Amino acid sequence: MSFLQEVGKRRTFAIISHPDAGKTTITEKVLLFGNAIQKAGTVKGRGSNQHAKSDWMEMEKERGISVTTSVMQFPFNDCLVNLLDTPGHEDFSEDTYRTLTAVDSCLMVIDAAKGVEDRTRKLMEVTRLRDTPIVTFMNKLDREVRDPMEVLDEVESELGMACAPISWPIGCGKEFKGVYHIHRDETILYESGHGHEIQEVRTIKGLDNPELDATVGADLAESVREELELVMGACPEFDHELFLAGELTPVYFGTALGNFGVDHMLEGLTDWAPAPQTRQANERDVVATEDKFSGFVFKIQANMDPKHRDRIAFMRIVSGTYTQGMKMNHVRTGKNVSISDAVTFMAGDRSRAETAYAGDIIGLHNHGTIQIGDTFTQGESLKFSGIPNFAPELFRRIRLKDPLKQKQLLKGLVQLSEEGAVQVFRPLQNNDLIVGAVGVLQFDVVVARLKAEYNVEAIYEGVSVATARWVDCADGKKMDEFQRKNQANLALDGGDNLTYIAPTMVNLNLASERFPDVQFRATREH
């Protein structure tokens, strides 16, 4: 297969949803249809050994939540799909935000009983920055749900995207009989109890087929015909151009747990979602089909293999081809490195990558030299833009149970901050270590990982910090004055960037009024 064909068949997407909308379940069913796994292990059975394939860190297995972003690659129809599973739990938004910078499209999973929820809104804001195309899956139709039309209206008004239904539900809850596939003009019937494997489904051609009335009942069949007449009048038809511009989303209905409707959604996604896209670097736009290799690191994951204390840097290939043993320019350090042991992923199962193409995600072994946002190229000096760090919203002081382990604690915290699990701040005026996170669960993860990976027992104490801002100033003299007068509020983060630690929002506002030339930033590019 030629290089252009290889790049053209790739589809790299992430799944976004509110916690508990069924994201991990849908990930599993997608893998089932991609023949990447033989049987789905439902996540709810937290006590059983059949844990979901994409939740593989100890803490995730214990709690039944996806904490880290896994990458899974599998073939479907004529495409090669790279699926990035993002943490669905309330607290892991920062990792999720960054993952969204590495994909070309997204699948949005909505719980049809609840509609658009808070976390989905936040994630959609990030996809908006790059007009990422979105495919929507309305989940949990085998339970009692809201009126589908009402949920579509909510998506349109709250997320600013037109909805084009591709399938439409026939009943819901105990009365859920299947979906009518608008593009195929056929009804696909649902049978419960087949969540773990792929079943042959029964279909009925045409909406006016008397067989439909005989199968689902005349009343339900008639009300579906009426609903569809309304839907066809009220909703736009699918338009590929608008979809690629992020202005319209195709909508599928089904139940991930019942393994129904996922395959139609996957067909739509592989047919319509874009192949690897052109990316903006600070210097120029980089086209996926260029010969020369380039890629950027969007995530670092520590100790994916408990048997080896290693760290893996996840790199999205933007252009060209990776071949085993090739030489790359690590742009930030200016060093040429030879990469012979990059890996590809199937959640937790790693295999050595011999070749990989634009759109693929590969893992580089990292011994502390690679950071989030780093660019690798075949010589050219490029820096890809738009890989954000977000100012934390929660802070704790971290303290050792054994004061002699200060060195291990610092090493562990710096490594965890480099991979984006948490942010660390060292005040200039004392020896405190302040940990900042976007959500509470991150604090638990840090303590658990410090103990498991660095043999350090740490505890938290409260600290009077409301927020943090990265500071810089074009005028050196004014910056010196600012530093002199604000020593007590200044700290260095894990990457030695100067940060203003504000005890209250009022304090932050006053500081920015007093020093108008100093910029206080809530996000920082890696």
Curated annotation (Swiss-Prot):
Q: Which PROSITE patterns match?
A: G_TR_1, G_TR_2
SUPFAM superfamilies recorded for this chain? Answer: EF-G C-terminal domain-like, P-loop containing nucleoside triphosphate hydrolases, Translation proteins
Please name the GO terms that the record assigns under molecular function.
GTP binding; GTPase activity; guanosine tetraphosphate binding; translation release factor activity, codon nonspecific; translation release factor activity, codon specific
GO biological process terms, alphabetically, are:
regulation of translational termination
Q: Which Pfam families match?
A: EF-G_D2, GTP_EFTU, RF3_C
The cysteines covalently paired via disulfide bonds are none
Report the principal subcellular site.
cytoplasm
Name its cellular compartments: Cytoplasm
Q: Which residues form a coiled coil?
A: none
The organism sits in which domain of life?
Answer: Bacteria
- Residues where GTP binds: 17-24, 85-89, 139-142
- Keyword annotations from UniProtKB, A to Z: Cytoplasm, GTP-binding, Nucleotide-binding, Protein biosynthesis
Output the Gene Ontology cellular-component terms: cytosol
The segment(s) forming the tr-type G domain are 8-277
Q: Which family does it belong to?
A: Belongs to the TRAFAC class translation factor GTPase superfamily. Classic translation factor GTPase family. PrfC subfamily.
Q: Entry's NCBIfam families?
A: prfC, PRK00741.1, small_GTP
Q: What's this protein's function?
A: Increases the formation of ribosomal termination complexes and stimulates activities of RF-1 and RF-2. It binds guanine nucleotides and has strong preference for UGA stop codons. It may interact directly with the ribosome. The stimulation of RF-1 and RF-2 is significantly reduced by GTP and GDP, but not by GMP.
- Record protein name field: Peptide chain release factor 3
